[in-house]
């Protein structure tokens, strides 16, 4: 299959620039993956589509305020750092702009000097290996000095950092939010549990590979970036019990989906596990664990659009996306949602 098979026309004004004031009042497009039938709802109506045997699998990762603005110690020139991946306690793989000023040995200052950094090596695809120096707790300093690493298509400033976190976020480490989860409120989750639906949590730390375009014509040649995941015993048991009792495993977001499919065996069973995944799901892939998916609307020609096409069929997805454009749904990270059932 070619990348161009996953292209669609999207007017720029449909790219959501800010989150909904009430998380669960975004719109919801419901797509039947067997028939291609479409319904138009509000996100909190998701309750009507869940049954007591089902389980929702949610990614409890928390976004780091990983964008730091600092200056070069030697010249005072302004620099932008984006933390990608922790390598050791105070050593990170980092994107640094402008890169030409970030040679090995270069030092940088952030805030009033409470955080300093030195480039100690070169990473993949132009990234830098950076060691940070500070007194106190790194996460607290980052919280104070860092900004949310919003995707490049969001131009507006985010007033409240928590609006780019899910209400159940817990495990710090992502460079982007698992955006399907942004639609849930604590009240909606409570109602879902009261209905007898099980909630199961796993962790996948979202990397910037999520936003990287596919640069090859033939999708099979694309290589994914690896991301860290973990699933505990309790979550594995909930998922296996759901399968045994004839319920559906409903992934909340493509990150939960990719984690489940990484861990699942040929029979759809999962177990306690952690590691790095670079799974690339595209049409032709047979899902082992995931029965249904809650997800946002993705970028044209993106790996995430290919993932949903593998679940519902490319024609069904492309048709649903064209309908969503026609009906002026809001797209991407702060946009509306889709339930593939």
Curated annotation (Swiss-Prot):
Instruction: Report the InterPro entries cross-referenced here.
Output: QueA, QueA_dom1, QueA_dom2, QueA_sf
Q: What does this protein do?
A: Transfers and isomerizes the ribose moiety from AdoMet to the 7-aminomethyl group of 7-deazaguanine (preQ1-tRNA) to give epoxyqueuosine (oQ-tRNA).
> Reaction(s) catalyzed by this protein?
7-aminomethyl-7-carbaguanosine(34) in tRNA + S-adenosyl-L-methionine = epoxyqueuosine(34) in tRNA + adenine + L-methionine + 2 H(+)
Q: What is this protein called?
A: S-adenosylmethionine:tRNA ribosyltransferase-isomerase
Summary of subunit composition and partner proteins? Monomer.
**Which keywords describe this protein according to UniProt?**
Cytoplasm, Queuosine biosynthesis, S-adenosyl-L-methionine, Transferase
HAMAP family from the xrefs? QueA
Compartments where found:
Cytoplasm
Question: From which source organism is this entry?
Answer: Clostridium botulinum (strain Langeland / NCTC 10281 / Type F)
A GO molecular-function descriptor:
S-adenosylmethionine:tRNA ribosyltransferase-isomerase activity
Q: What is its EC number?
A: 2.4.99.17
**GO BP field:** queuosine biosynthetic process; tRNA wobble guanine modification
Q: Indicate the principal place this protein occupies in or around the cell.
A: cytoplasm
Q: Which SUPFAM superfamilies match?
A: QueA-like
This protein's GO CC annotations: cytoplasm
Q: If you read the UniProt record, what top EC class would you report for this enzyme, in one word?
A: transferase
Source organism, top-level taxon: Bacteria
Q: Which family does it belong to?
A: Belongs to the QueA family.
Pfam families given in the database record: Queuosine_synth
């Amino acid at each position: 299959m070619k990348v161009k098979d996953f292209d669609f026309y999207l007017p720029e004004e449909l790219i959501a620039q800010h989150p909904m004031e009430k998380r669960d009042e975004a719109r919801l497009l419901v797509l039947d993956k067997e028939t291609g039938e479409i319904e138009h709802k509000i996100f909190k109506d998701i309750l009507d589509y869940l049954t007591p045997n089902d389980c929702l699998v949610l990614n409890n990762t928390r976004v780091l305020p990983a964008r730091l603005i600092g200056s070069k110690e030697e010249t005072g020139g302004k620099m932008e750092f984006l933390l990608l991946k922790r390598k050791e306690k105070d050593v990170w793989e980092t994107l640094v702009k402008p890169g030409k000023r970030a040679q090995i040995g270069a030092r940088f200052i952030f805030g009033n000097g409470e955080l300093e950094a030195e480039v100690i090596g070169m990473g993949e695809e132009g990234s830098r290996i950076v060691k940070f120096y500070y007194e106190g707790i790194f996460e607290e300093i980052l919280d104070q000095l860092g900004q949310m690493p919003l995707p490049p298509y969001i131009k507006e400033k985010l007033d409240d950092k928590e609006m780019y976190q899910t209400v159940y976020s817990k495990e710090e480490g992502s460079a982007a939010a698992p955006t399907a989860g942004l639609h849930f409120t604590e009240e909606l989750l409570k109602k879902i549990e009261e209905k007898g639906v099980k909630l199961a949590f796993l962790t996948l730390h979202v990397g910037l590979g999520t936003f990287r375009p596919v640069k090859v014509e033939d999708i099979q040649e694309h290589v994914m970036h690896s991301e860290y995941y973990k699933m505990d015993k309790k979550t594995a048991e909930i998922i296996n019990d759901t399968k045994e009792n004839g319920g559906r495993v409903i992934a909340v977001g493509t990150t939960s989906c990719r984690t489940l499919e990484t861990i699942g065996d040929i029979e759809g069973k999962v177990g306690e596990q952690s590691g790095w995944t670079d799974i690339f799901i595209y049409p032709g892939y047979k899902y082992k664990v995931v029965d249904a998916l809650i997800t946002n609307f993705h970028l044209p020609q993106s790996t995430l659009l290919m993932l949903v096409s593998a679940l519902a069929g490319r024609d069904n997805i492309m048709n649903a996306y064209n309908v969503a454009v026609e009906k002026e749904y809001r797209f991407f990270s702060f946009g509306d949602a889709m339930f593939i059932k």
